[in-house]
Amino acid sequence: MSAPTPNGSKTYDLVVIGAGTAAMVGAMRVRAAGKSVAIVDCRPYGGTCALRGCDPKKMLIGGANAVDHVRRMHPNGVTGDVAIEWPSLMRFKRSFTDPVPAKHEQRYAEKGIDAYHGTARFTGRNSLSISGEDLEFTHVLVAAGAE
């Protein structure tokens, strides 16, 4: 947990910017070592891979591959019409991606990591602001992927 400073800002040993896999690993390891940690992201927690990239892509490609495979096997005795019903496939994908942000936030809370939502803006060498809330830190980890 953070320690308040005389000016009202919170102080952490580490502030992590980004909330994807790399950010989570860094935050959890530092917290496990007994240090105070905060994590901030302007998007839902989970990162690109879990929410918008790798994982959902695999689910969508799985449906496309199944249709393609059946169609290519049609001359070899596999019969029947197959098609992707996009609303159902998207519901399937969302059944995996929608719970991710809440699970991440719950995990951070259980470990004593403070979670912030918003855009982190550096205000000094060891300080930043998130939607008007000031944080000070000893170390910062920018784990924001390509952004």
Which role does the model predict for each range below?
Residues 24:
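Residues forming the Rossmann-fold NAD(P)(H) cofactor-binding site
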